Amino acid sequence: DAHAQEAGRFSSEAFGGERPYTIYFSKRVNRATASGESVPRYEGLVDSLDYEAELGVILGRDAKGVSKENAGAYIFGYTIINDISARNLQTRHKQWYLGKSLDGFTPMGPCIVTADEIGDEQALDISCTVNGELRQSSNTRFMIQTVCGAIAELSEGMTLAAGTIIATGTPAGVGLGMKPPTFLQHGDKIVCSIEKIGSL
């Protein structure tokens, strides 16, 4: 309890106010959910299920101390990730990990497109529909941090192994941000799409 209190004071000082640096966090993936598969509801545990369309970056080589200028050489390819999130668990535990890491919470696909086929990864349209209604519509040029910038920052003090997948964040339009908040219901069909990759 005492450590929780002192950590709380530190968190308020360290994480409050403006955020000049990118926020990174881990997401456990027991098994990626294939395109077309259902996402589990977890009745009784999850009451606010949400979607997040994101560009996924797959590394093809171990990366350590990589510069932003050279980071592109470490990218094998790209895919689409729907970063399914249980908002009530995020709120309850005051962090992202558990609410994003339940089994089945990482739909990924429908394929991997190699980096040479994508070209400029910072110029891709990204969208998400729920039951045909457009909820998210943006472009990767609006990302807070570039793909290469994220690889450079993350590899400063740790090795990113070949095969590492980086989800690069989601644009506005998630259910949590709607007024009133509108979360996923049983039977909803979510389609995440990214230019040059396809739809998940």
Residue ranges with predicted function:
Residues 1-134, 185:
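Active-site microenvironments in enzyme catalytic cores
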